[in-house]
């Protein structure tokens, strides 16, 4: 809606190589509302095996387009092509796995000491999920959030890192090719309050899944408190490299 764009740089030479849309607050709001509309539609009502078909189709698209996706992620991040290409094939298995899990979600029957009363639990989709992805592993860390969310019948707004967003916009085109209902998966990128804060304070966002640093995580926790959104945070790990 804002029609603003920005250039993303190739870290090999620090030269611009792609132009991507910059989401305004209105764009972010529009993406969340599209996800909410999709959640109120057919998507969560589909049989799990029907949702599984879309997840498997996403996996197939990843395998068929691994070279293209790997090349884009390499140019955008500087990671080795042999790594990004293999990773695109590898993460297809995430979508396959959660496709298989979609129809295996069970509730429980709880013992209760009152006659003629039965207590049961059931699992239902939570709603709109905001998935916030860091620059250094866009495709992989999207898979860890998107695949389980879709399998359970949720809709998703993916906030791509503004440092290396190009590959997720291409991935979104592949997802669209599967025929998944409009609004189920949305991809945005942008800066500061207009994108990140608007997304994490939005009253229609029920869950926030974030991978990144502790400073941003603290802001997300504060923002999520406004609507009591559920939050899951992955804030890095100890991965020493001996040279």
Language-model regions, residue ranges each:
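Active-site-adjacent beta-strand anchor residues
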Residues: 21, 132, 157-161, 188-189, ...
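Conserved small-residue-rich beta-alpha loop and adjacent elements
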Residues: 108-182, 228
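Conserved NAD(P)+-binding/catalytic subdomain of aldehyde/semialdehyde dehydrogenases
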Residues: 128, 177-243
């Amino acid at each position: 809606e804002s029609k603003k764009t920005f250039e993303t740089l190739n870290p090999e030479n620090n030269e611009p190589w792609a132009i991507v849309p910059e989401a305004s607050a209105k764009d972010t709001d529009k993406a969340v509302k599209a996800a909410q509309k999709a959640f109120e539609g057919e998507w969560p009502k589909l049989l799990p095996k029907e949702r599984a078909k879309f997840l498997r189709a996403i996996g197939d698209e990843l395998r068929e387009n691994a070279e293209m996706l790997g090349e884009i992620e390499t140019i955008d991040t500087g990671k080795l092509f042999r790594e990004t290409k293999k990773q695109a094939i590898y993460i297809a298995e995430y979508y396959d796995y959660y496709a298989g899990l979609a129809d295996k979600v069970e509730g429980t029957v709880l013992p209760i000491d009152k006659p003629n009363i039965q207590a049961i639990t059931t699992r239902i989709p939570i709603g709109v999920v905001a998935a916030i992805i860091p620059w250094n592993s866009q495709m992989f860390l999207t898979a860890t959030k998107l695949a389980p969310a879709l399998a359970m019948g949720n809709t998703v707004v993916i906030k791509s890192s503004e440092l290396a967003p190009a590959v997720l916009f291409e991935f979104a085109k592949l997802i669209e090719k599967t025929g998944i209902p409009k609004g189920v998966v949305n991809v945005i990128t942008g800066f500061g309050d207009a994108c990140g804060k608007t997304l994490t304070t939005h009253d229609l966002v029920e869950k926030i899944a974030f991978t990144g640093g502790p400073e941003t995580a603290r802001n997300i926790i504060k923002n999520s408190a406004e609507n009591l959104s559920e939050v899951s945070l992955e804030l890095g790990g100890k991965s020493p490299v001996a040279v």
